[in-house]
Amino acid sequence: PDLSFLGDLQGLLISVAPTRRNEAYGDVFERGMRSLAAALRRRISTQPLHITYISSVSVYGDQRGEEVNESAALDTRSPVNSMLATAEELMLDIDRPDTSICVLRLGGIYGPGRDMVGMIREAAGQQVPKNGNAINAWSSLVDIARGVQFACDQRLSGVYNLVDDMQLSRRELSTLICDQEGLPPVLWNHTSSPTDRGMNARVSNQKIKDAGFQLVSPSMLQPVTA
């Protein structure tokens, strides 16, 4: 494909999520990311370029609920996590003095069109086949959009967790929501299934805050109008 247009860009947002677990898809995804990284490395341009690559905090895997930051080791046992980690590395390895690369790791997404609180209410009293003791990280759509703009404006380089402040297990979050509404609790499993990617960590967002970013949505329990 003709990727000569890359030389005209000043900013580039890459958001491609590997969603299939089979090996053939993994090869296609990795080959595509390698081709894009190679094209970015050899682009002909006289202007600087900032790249933002959207990844996921799921790459931390099961950390037994411990706090993790951007320097933590990644859990690549899952095929999807392995693809994400490889893509991050390919982007960060683009070695050009006129190119800055920022990886934003997102949590589960909520906001306009993704009413997670409403989904939890609908699950009240039902059995959900996921580990209720696992701690997830969350990202507001509003803060994702703001974070991408912030990364570009500030020419951020390296890896940043773009997640909100909430660090509750699935069970704690659903119980809090259901109790407020007088609903029966969601019935979760107590362990992860073999097919679960096993995210269980308190993901720190301190690095991006230290860079000057301010959340408008500290948690999904505090509604924000986009």
Question: What is the predicted role of each segment?
Answer:
Residues 196-226:
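C-terminal amphipathic/interface module of NAD(P)-dependent oxidoreductases
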Residues 64-103:
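Catalytic helix-loop patch of NAD(P)-dependent Rossmann-fold dehydrogenases
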Residues 15, 51-57, 104-106:
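SDR active-site strand-loop-helix element
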Residues 120-130, 183-188:
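A short C-terminal helix-loop "cap" of Rossmann-like NAD(P)-dependent dehydrogenase/epimerase domains
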